Amino acid sequence: MKVLITGVNGFIGQALFSYLSEQTDYSVFVTSRKFYQAGLRPDEIFFVSDISNSTNWMSILSGVDVVIHLAARAHVLEKDGVNSANQFNSTNVDGTLQLARHALQSGVSRFIFISSIGVNGAETINK
């Protein structure tokens, strides 16, 4: 079974990759913005610099049975300026929808989306 994990450099992604790569029934592939995850072989990594509604996932999803989507923008920072909320939405909403649509079109049989409250942004009340 071919499994694609997005967000492999995060806490859950690292643990999930380690676990699944030890299982003999799985061929595990990952996406990453940057490479630093120890133990990954280059043929297991697809570099995706931007997750948005314009990301083309079709070649990456070829032959994939399961997508486990963990990648997200977890922080909206003041220094990002006026467009930070738009960038946040572009990755976490539009980018996730684009991946799900392409997974459906590619015949992926399972799409597992793991998220947290952090994708809604963190804001201090009465700041």
PLM region spans:
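N-terminal Rossmann NAD(P)H-binding glycine-rich loop of SDR-like oxidoreductase domains
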Residues: V3-Q23
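Conserved Rossmann-like nucleotide-binding pocket used by diverse enzymes
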Residues: L4, F29, F47, N89, ...
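SDR active-site strand-loop-helix element
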Residues: T6, T31, V67-R73, F111-I117
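Conserved glycine-rich Rossmann-like NAD(P)H-binding loop of the short-chain dehydrogenase/reductase
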Residues: D25-K34
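NAD(P)H-binding glycine-rich loop region in Rossmannoid oxidoreductase-like domains
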Residues: Y36-Q37, E44-T91, H102, V119-A122
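Conserved Rossmann-fold NAD(P)-dependent oxidoreductase catalytic core, especially the SDR/UDP-sugar
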Residues: D94-K127
